[in-house]
Amino acid sequence: MMMLKIGPYEFSSRLLLGTGKYPSLDVQKEAVEASGAEILTFAVRRMNIFSPEQPNFLEQLDLSKYKLLPNTAGAKTAEEAVRIARLAKASGLCDMIKVEVIGCDKTLLPDPIETLKAAEMLLEEGFIVLPYTSDDVVLAKRLEELGCHAIMPGASPIGSGQGIINPLNLSFIIEQANVPVIVDAGIGGPADAALAMELGADGVLLNTAVSGAADPVKMAKAMKLAVEAGRLGYEAGRIPKKRYASASSPTEGMSVV
């Protein structure tokens, strides 16, 4: 498979993994390793990045193996998102940022206007910007035109496990994009991840589907395989759907009984 390219970085794995809500730090570490992910995302507001005396998951990982993708979860305005992003960058962890500006506490759907504003401000400051957005086709294009390095449309609401609700819109976003499209949020199981990749997505970001599973480590491995299978299937090119049957064996030369 081809490498996933985001800005100046290249990755072998197309699975991006969130680091929240695992049963324990040990399970989290095992799941991260089982997933094969090379990009790990975390909420800056939930990390003690400037308090070394406080435990956090970064302490138990070999950071030479991973690229960290801080996110601005908790931000309600563009200005809040920018402040959080600056805090992450000041820690020296990474220059990539996942822009997340929530517009509705009940659905956790992103605020399109504030997301666009935050992305523009952060791009001006030299960040590598990956905005979390809805499956709005026009907004996705506007974010790309702004200069975002990848687009991250949601499959369904965060943590809902509903899978891909609108595959048509996702396919439109993917078709028109000239930057990576990473399906983010709502993935419930391996079939959802595989479908996202079969649609042509460049990657999948998930968290709750693994951390909330009965066996997070086993689910992490399942997601790894699903993303790989979906991408291989997309690159191979599936057969077109037809209304009627088509024999899989050649009919030439068959004797008449």
From Swiss-Prot:
UniProt record, GO biological process: thiamine diphosphate biosynthetic process
Known catalytic reactions: [ThiS sulfur-carrier protein]-C-terminal-Gly-aminoethanethioate + 2-iminoacetate + 1-deoxy-D-xylulose 5-phosphate = [ThiS sulfur-carrier protein]-C-terminal Gly-Gly + 2-[(2R,5Z)-2-carboxy-4-methylthiazol-5(2H)-ylidene]ethyl phosphate + 2 H2O + H(+)
Pathway(s) of this molecule: Cofactor biosynthesis; thiamine diphosphate biosynthesis
Active site, UniProt feature: K98
Cellular component terms (Gene Ontology): cytoplasm
Cell compartments where the protein resides: Cytoplasm
Subunit comment: Homotetramer. Forms heterodimers with either ThiH or ThiS.
Function: Catalyzes the rearrangement of 1-deoxy-D-xylulose 5-phosphate (DXP) to produce the thiazole phosphate moiety of thiamine. Sulfur is provided by the thiocarboxylate moiety of the carrier protein ThiS. In vitro, sulfur can be provided by H(2)S.
PANTHER family to which the protein is assigned, alphabetical: THIAZOLE SYNTHASE
Protein name as it appears in the record: Thiazole synthase
